[in-house]
């Protein structure tokens, strides 16, 4: 039952991240600030709340033990956390905290999005330089290649796990560099800045 409702809620909310990335592209591309100013303003605004909340989430299992609460409390919040978290060990919590620069832990899985967001912010000044100079046709070609890349997981699932140069020792196939959330950035920018008037569309 947990898996069913988790899948139901997840499917309903799944579009939120791509939509947010599209809004980011619509509002920020092309960048108006200098690269150093942009990094200081955007990344610092995200980094410190992310770090504080990640630490608190990873300390949560240990804090429940400190308060004398049952490990079942942890499973109520994090059903997939497993036996390691249920030990309520400070050592395990500290190990999770030490691994924050590398990845999220089993108790702060939802923080995956912040790693994505920081990566997009690091990438934006470089992408912005291209967006500012690129023609509409070039942007449409990028979006077409990116759109095809979004269909590849279905190909992997139902046809073959490898295509266009991909194999067991090379995951960088032909459209690899068009794939990912950068397409949502450009799509948001394009939808906002394209002339959608009826006359323009008919022409």
At which residue positions do the language-model features occur?
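Functionally critical transmembrane alpha-helices in membrane proteins and complexes, commonly lining
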Residues: 1-31, 46-58, 173-174, 179-180
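Transmembrane-helix boundary and interhelical linker motifs in polytopic inner-membrane proteins
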Residues: 29-40
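Active-site helix-to-loop segments that bind/position phosphate- or nucleotide-bearing substrates
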Residues: 43
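N-terminal low-complexity, intrinsically disordered segments
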Residues: 68-70, 203
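Extracytoplasmic catalytic-loop and juxtamembrane helix elements of membrane-embedded
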Residues: 71-81, 164
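Alpha-helical transmembrane segments and terminal signal-anchor/GPI-anchor hydrophobic tails
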Residues: 197-203
């Amino acid at each position: 039952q947990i898996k069913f409702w988790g899948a139901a809620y997840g499917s309903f909310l799944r579009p939120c991240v791509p939509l947010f990335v599209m809004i980011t592209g619509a509002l920020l591309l092309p960048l108006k600030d200098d690269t150093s100013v942009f990094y200081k303003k955007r990344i610092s605004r995200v980094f410190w709340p992310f770090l504080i909340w990640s630490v608190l989430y990873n300390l949560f299992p240990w804090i429940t033990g400190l308060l004398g609460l049952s490990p079942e409390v942890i499973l109520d919040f994090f059903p997939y956390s497993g036996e390691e978290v249920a030990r309520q060990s400070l050592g395990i919590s500290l190990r999770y905290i030490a691994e924050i620069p590398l990845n999220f832990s089993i108790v702060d899985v939802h923080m995956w999005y912040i790693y994505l967001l920081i990566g997009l912010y690091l990438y934006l000044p470089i992408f912005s330089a291209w967006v500012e100079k690129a023609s509409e046709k070039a942007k449409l070609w990028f979006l077409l290649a990116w759109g095809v890349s979004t269909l590849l997981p279905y190909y992997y699932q139902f046809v073959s796990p490898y295509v266009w140069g991909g194999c067991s020792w090379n995951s960088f196939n032909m459209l690899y560099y068009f794939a990912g959330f950068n397409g949502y950035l450009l799509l948001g920018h394009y939808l906002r800045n394209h002339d959608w008037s009826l006359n323009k569309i008919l022409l």
